[in-house]
């Protein structure tokens, strides 16, 4: 049975953040010459049934594969839970993709997307951490079809280690470093996942990192060559 709760961080945060980016790009396209620099089309999607087994994204991929349109999609970026209260600036690590279920062609691009997100956080002088490419979110069906994927994740029921807390303390200060040996989102799948559960600082920077990556990829002259060398 799916859990019952407000779902503000999981996954209202990623849903709203993606919508904010889509609206901002829409304004840029209408009011500026932004389109002149775009080399790829963007499609913003919100999937249903993730908690019940990635139902929405799986159905989309199945239908797109059946009608031949799946080949139009070069990359999938996934933003699921990006405002956890005891957050990590988590980046999906392409190197941890399951080699038994992931086509080889998806790996170089997925690793490059990982580096792209790292680039943002290092430019902003922010800490970051690798997150496992577990397939538990809606990028999974795309990755399984050989499409390069990447994304951001501030954490769910994982624990923040002492090393992580100390590193965040050095870079962010005591107010933003969180607690060691504590769950990243103690309200994960619980009724307390309300607006008060959202870490606004983490959320802001995760949305900015998402926007940075989308903008970069959309403007690449040869996106497919970059993803699939």
Where are the model-predicted features located?
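Generic, ordered loop/turn and secondary-structure boundary motif
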Residues: 9, 61, 83, 129, ...
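Short amphipathic alpha-helical segments at helix-loop
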Residues: 3-6, 102, 191, 195-198
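Solvent-exposed, polar/charged alpha-helical surfaces in well-ordered, non-transmembrane soluble domains
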Residues: 16-19, 23, 27, 58, ...
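Alpha-helical metal-binding/catalytic segments enriched in His/Glu/Asp
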Residues: 1-54, 210-213
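Metal-dependent peptidase/peptidase-like ectodomains
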Residues: 37, 47-184
């Amino acid at each position: 049975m799916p859990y019952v709760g407000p779902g503000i961080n999981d996954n209202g945060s990623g849903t709203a953040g993606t919508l904010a980016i889509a609206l901002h790009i829409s304004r840029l396209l209408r009011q500026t010459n932004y389109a002149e620099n775009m080399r790829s089309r963007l499609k913003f999607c919100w999937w249903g049934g993730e908690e019940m087994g990635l139902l929405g994204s799986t159905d989309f991929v199945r239908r797109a594969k059946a009608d031949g349109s799946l080949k139009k999609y070069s990359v999938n970026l996934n933003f699921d839970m990006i405002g956890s209260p005891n957050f990590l600036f988590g980046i999906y690590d392409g190197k941890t993709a399951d080699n038994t279920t992931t086509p080889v062609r998806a790996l170089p691009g997925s690793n490059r997307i990982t580096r792209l997100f790292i680039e943002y956080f290092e430019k902003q002088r922010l800490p970051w951490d690798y997150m496992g490419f577990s397939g538990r979110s809606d990028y999974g069906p795309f990755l399984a079809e050989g499409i390069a994927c990447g994304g951001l994740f501030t954490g769910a029921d994982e624990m923040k280690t002492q090393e992580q807390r100390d590193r965040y303390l050095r870079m962010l200060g005591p107010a933003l470093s969180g607690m060691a040996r504590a769950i990243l989102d103690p309200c994960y799948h619980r009724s307390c996942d309300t607006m008060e559960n959202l870490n606004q600082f983490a959320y802001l920077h995760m949305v900015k990192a998402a926007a940075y990556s989308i903008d970069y990829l959309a403007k690449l002259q040869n996106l497919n060559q970059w993803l699939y060398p």
